[in-house]
Structures are given as structure tokens and as C-alpha cells.
């Protein structure tokens, strides 16, 4: 059973592996489009969708059990996530992940489950959420101005993207001409690739176009300048951390040059955009803060004079926006300060989590890439954006381990507008110190991004190999199952044969009944002339061993009908097989088919050579013996009707009218007298009858016939088998004629002795002479004795055709008899050779012979009455015990019920006891 379960599991695993890889649906990377404190908006790419529709792909959050197996906490706010499959017009399918509430956690770790018609997918995703630092709507209302202040105002607009977005440079163009209100952040964002962060692109533009910036500061881009667009390789010359540090340093330098009187109490840029939650907050300012306009120091740009007219209007607009946002920022300042402490602790935990998840993410995602590094940059600059009252924390932050977590944009790298309240710039050494320690080696990251494919990866990427391996494994398992099933079947067959053999022996022992009530049963001895056939039966037993073996198996399981059918088919093929017929007799005895038992017994008698086995079966199944005897009588009647035989069995006649020699009683008597008159020629018999009429002295027929036979004293009879030579019969004119002899009885002079009632078949359709010599007297006496000694059945027909006293003149009825005798052929010569005794010798029957015949007759009557009265009930009890030993409870109950109805008190008590045992 354990092996079978293991095989089933292996087959199921191979089937799942083969069918799942055949379709090839997969989950790609996740792309984040929202920031912290905003409703989640992300997309998960679907790979190898092929012909699947949106309705066939069902994504959802995994079950708690799957979270538990993966070792991931299933937090409550994850239940707000909604997964929607989207098929885009370009054929690219994604799963859109959204939430109805703003996400206030810095990162999300969850399992996505995707169901489709051919299988199921599970994948873990970790999303880092950055706080929104700036929105492009901040300076939407500001007019265009050629002065440097408005140009610098647009610089902070770029950090709106929290995660790197794939952008491509304009096709067919390697340069870009700046216009009014352009910022380097926007230009760099439009021309960078996914692997390049915005700070890296900004510094690459500055390095390639140094003359386009005032004082070499990225926040002072000149209008109308033609910028050469750097390549991706040039943008990747600096690491994201180093580029971020340099951008922060230039932002602080630019703020310091713009606000020299602000001192060390530098304030953060204010975010005047409308959003649900403020992404940053400035430090507290004194109530005496004032706003004053200053001109930019250093060289002016070439287009600075052109925008002088719009300066006043731009400043007024910016001042109005600043005043509106100042009140709200003051109210949120205290709340943000407390939240920053929480965020700092969460960042520390996040650093450890990222270190632990690096290996797992590399295996599951396949490519880590610069996208993760770009996403970690805002977190690195988060302390600088959220702690305005600690100016020294900004340069120190990149040196901490938190800088390893990639974030998309730096915090506070550009001022809001000239209308900003005056703040003091941080010390110069603090601004220049961060770049030094922030020089990580990007080589290990790129090595992790593109690991060398292993053999297992190549195998999993090739569905054909997977199908071949799965099919081979399945075929091997099927072959193994077939071998095991054949072995089990062979083992079961051997066990069944062994069980059948043991059961057959037990049944033979159980059904081997004793000879309790059958000691006085006398059966006919087997004919001596066919006793030599037995060795032939043993010689050919092996030819039908298969049929006998199968029959034994059916018998052991109680399927007697199938066993009988099998044996009948085998007998039909080999009708001379006595062993098959013996086995069929045994099956009939088990089934209670008495007619079949008797029929097979008669056939075995005709074949010969199996009489001892038949007697053994009769002793085992005594209930079949009476039926066999009745079948024998029926066969005798049939033979009598067909005029096929003349039989005289166990005939013992006593000469009551004449004295017999005493030594005649010591003769060895033979109980069988069989005379076959089959195929006798009628013409020859008539000729013999006419040629000699002195063989029979006296023949008297009446409704009740008494037969008295006498023999000369000087001629003893050695054997009761004698032949009748119809040529020696003499006519008897004084003998009366009878048209019909319905009752034919032979009465002996001794009234107390009975002869055997064996078949006495005598069919003589010819005239019998009435006279015979005195020394060969054979008299049929019409005087009735005191009681009949031998009574034959009513249908016993001994017909003697009426004839006139003169045999030479037959009546008309003899013409038909002669016509019938014309058809007799083969056995006349053989019969004539056997009937060679002297004409004057007739059988001699003594008183002792009659006594022996009477005793045999009485014994036979007693033997055939063994099923009457109490003997029948006792036999049924024995049969019931045999059925119980065989396990046939139903058959035993039926027999015991009959014993309760027919038996005496002791037998009924024993039957009840057996029934209680069966209950």
C-alpha cells in the first residue's frame, strides 16, 4: 500500500510538472507607480500568456496557509489589496495591484496567487515605498522668466517619480536645446534608461555640457543651450550613491549661496502641491521670519537680462503660494517630527530585512538590476528630507548602511523659489564630506543581476526536455505497475491453487462417511472382463490435469455450476476419460443433482474400468445410491420396451415337485444370467423352433405363474448361466394360450423363501412348443402358492405370440413377427456358439439354491430401504455435518429442518444442537 501511494504521488507530480510547463504561464517583475501615504498602484508582468484571456487568469492574495508555509507574515492591511488582470492593446498582459486606502508602511511583503485552467502560480513580492518629495504641480502657475531664479525654481520638480521609469532618448537626436523653465532633472529623466538613476544622468549631462550651467551648479541651467545627451555608459560612470551625494552637495551649496543670512537654521523646501498627505515638513521657524529678495551671486546667464520684466510677477506668485502653504506646514510639523522617528527605526529594520532577502530575491526574480538600486535612493536621502533642524545628518546619511537601500529621488536637493524664507546654509565641510565614504563597488550588483544559467535553469527553461523526462518517468512507473500487478496475480493464483488443494483434502476427509447403516448393502461386483482397463485411465490422467485442476479450484470456492460446465466441455472433447466423469459425479453429488449422478454412473459402467472409484463415491455420498438404483430400474424398463436384452439376475429356483441331489446345494452359484437377443434373425429362430420341439417338456402360462424346475439327479449344474436353444423346444398342444401377460410372476414351492427381484427380461415373440421329454421337464405351474415368491413390476411384459397347436400353420399375427425378425443380423452366430449345451440338460435348482436366492433378495430389499424411517433422518444428519464442515451453512440448515420434521426425538435434539452452532 505504501509503494502504491508513493507511485501515485510520483505520477501526480510528473503530471503536474509536465502540464504546467507545457503552457508556461509565469509572473514577471513588479513595477511600482505610487509612493508612501498614497493608495498602492503597481503592475506585475504576466509572461507567456499566449491565448489566455482576462477571464481565465484569476490573481489573488495567497491564503494564510501559503503565507505560513513561506514564512511571511500576512498582515491585515494586505487584505485591502486588489488584483486585476489587464490585457494591454500591445498584447502585453499585466496584473494591476491597487488598494483603496493609502499605504502607510514603508514596504510591503506579500504572496500573489494566480490561477488559470492548467495550474496555479505562487510568487512572493517585496515592494519598497518612498515618501513623495515633490510634485510637478508646485510651479505650474509660475510664468516663464529668463532669470536664473525661475529656472532654479523648476529644479525640484523632477523628484516626483518614486521609482525608476523606463524612458528613452529621442530617436535620431543626440542633442537637446533648453527652453525657459527647463530643469536638468526633467531633461535627465526623459533621456535616462532603467539602469540609470536621475542623479547619475544629471551629473553626466553636467560633465558633458559644463558651459550650460552657471557656476557649475546643476540648479542653474542656462536657457537656449544645446545640450549633448550622454550615453548610458557615461551615465553609469558614477554609482547611484556617489551621484546622489554630489547632487545633495550642489543643492546645499546653491541654497547657501542664495540665502547667506539664514545661518545654520536651514529650512526645507515647502511643498505647495495638493495631496492627501504631506511628504516632508520644514523645521520650525521663528515668528519673526521674513521674506526678502536677493539676487543670485556669480555670473549671470546669457538669457538672464531677457527675463527681467517677468521677475516681479513670478516672485509675487511664488510668495502667494508660499504663504498659503506656510500655515499648513506649521501644523503638520510636529506630527511629522514624531513620524520621522518611527520611520528611522523602520528603516533600520528594513536594512536588516533587505540583507536577509537579497539571496531569496536573486533566486526568485532572476535579475536584480539597477531598478532596485534606483528604488533605494530616496530612502538613503530620507533623513536629509525629514530632519530640517539637523543639517549635519544629510551628509552623514549616505555613509550609513541605509544608503544601500535604493530609492528613486533625493530629498531636498533643490529650493522651492526665491520667495523661500531666509535660512542659514549648512557648513561647507559637512556638505562636501558625504561623497567620500559613499563609493560602493557596483560590480557585485551586476554579477548578481546576471548569474550564469545552471543546468537546472536550462532544463526548466526547455519545456521539451521536461515533457520527455516526465513522459519517460510516467512510462517507467506504468511498466513497474504492470510488473507488480502480474506478480501479485501469479501469487494469488498460486495461493488459490494451494488453498483449493488443502480444501479438497479437507472436504474428502469430512465427507468420508462411515459405513454405519450400510454394512448390509450389497452392490454388484465389477465385470471381470473390463478390469484391465484401469491402467489406461491412470496413464492418461495427465492429459486433463489442467481441466481437473481448474475444476478443483471451482469446487473449493463452491462454484459447482462452473465446475460442472467445465467438466462437461472436457468430456465432450474426450468422452473416454473416466477421471473427468468421476470428477463430474463428485460435482453432481455436491450439487444434489441425482439424475446427473446416475447418468454418469451408467456411462462409466458402459466404459468400464472405474467401478472401484464409483463405489468409493457412493460410499462418500450415500444419498445418491438410491437414485442410482432407481435409474437402473428405469434403464431396465427402457430395455424391456425396446426388446434389446434378455436379463435374468439372481434367479434361484427350487425344485419343489422333484427331489434334488444333496450335492447340488454346494454348487457355486452365479447371480447373473444375461441373455441378449439383440439383432436375432426371425427366420433363423423359426427354423430352429420347427426343427426341434423336444427341448421344453411342459410350459404352462397363467395370470399367476409358478415355476418349478427339476433336473436329473445324476447331472449336477455347475453354473446358473445357461443358454436356451430354441431349436430344442417341443410343442405342447395342451398348453393354454394367453393374449396378454400383464403380470408375470414366478412362484416357488417354498413359501418362506423369496427370490431376488432383479430384472427378469424375457421377450420371446415366437411360438413355444408345448411338449417336452419327461426328463427335461420345465413346468410353469398355474396353481398359486401360499404367497408369491417373486413379483415383477406391472409393466414387465413377457409376450408369447399365440400360435396354433400345429406350428406349421401360424396365424396372421406371426406374419408381422416374421417381418420384424427379418431385420435381425449380427448376433445370431455368436448366440449359437454360446448355446452349445446338450439338449437334454436343463437347469437344476435345489432347495439350498432357493434359500440363498431368498436371502439375497431380502438383503437387497433391506439395502435399498436405507433411506426410510430413522435411517433416512440419520443420513441427513450426517450430510448436514458434512455441509457444516464444508462451510455451506444454508444447505445444512435446509437438511436440519427436514430432520426436525421427520426424525425421532434424539435426532431432532441433535439437529437443534447443530442449528444452534450455526446461529
From Swiss-Prot:
Annotated signal sequence is: 1-24
Q: What is its main location?
A: membrane
InterPro entries xref list = FimV_C_sf (IPR038440), LysM_dom (IPR018392), LysM_dom_sf (IPR036779), Motility_prot_FimV_C (IPR020011), Motility_prot_FimV_N (IPR020012), TPR-like_helical_dom_sf (IPR011990)
Q: Give the phenotype of cells or organisms lacking this gene.
A: Mutants are incapable of twitching motility. In addition, loss of FimV dramatically reduces the levels of the PilQ secretin multimer through which pili exit the cell.
SUPFAM superfamilies, per the entry: TPR-like
- GO MF, one example: peptidoglycan binding
Could you list the residue ranges forming a coiled coil in this record? 319-367
Superkingdom classification of source: Bacteria
Q: Where is this region: Disordered?
A: 140-177, 237-312, 372-445, 785-816
Q: Which UniProt keywords apply?
A: Cell inner membrane, Cell membrane, Coiled coil, Membrane, Signal, Transmembrane, Transmembrane helix
Q: Does the keyword Heme apply?
A: no
Kindly list the cysteine pairs connected by disulfide bridges.
none
* Subcellular compartments: Cell inner membrane
Q: Where is the composition biased (Basic and acidic residues)?
A: 299-312
Q: Where are the transmembrane segments?
A: 464-484
**Residues covered by the LysM domain:** 174-229
Q: What is this protein for, i.e. what is its function?
A: Inner membrane hub protein that plays both cAMP-dependent and cAMP-independent roles in twitching motility. Regulates intracellular cyclic AMP (cAMP) levels through the activation of adenylate cyclase CyaB. Plays an essential role in a number of virulence mechanisms including type IV pilus (T4P)-mediated assembly and twitching motility as well as cAMP-dependent virulence gene expression. Also mediates type II secretion (T2S) of lipases and proteases. In addition, mediates the cAMP-independent localization of multiple T4P structural and regulatory components to the cell poles.
Subunit and partners:
Interacts with FimL. Interacts with DgcP.
Domain remark text: The N-terminal domain binds peptidoglycans through LysM motif. In addition, this motif is required for PilQ stability and multimerization. The cytoplasmic domain contains three discontinuous tetratricopeptide repeat (TPR) motifs involved in protein-protein interactions.
What protein does this entry describe?
A: Motility hub protein FimV
Organism, scientific name: Pseudomonas aeruginosa (strain ATCC 15692 / DSM 22644 / CIP 104116 / JCM 14847 / LMG 12228 / 1C / PRS 101 / PAO1)
Encoding gene (name): fimV
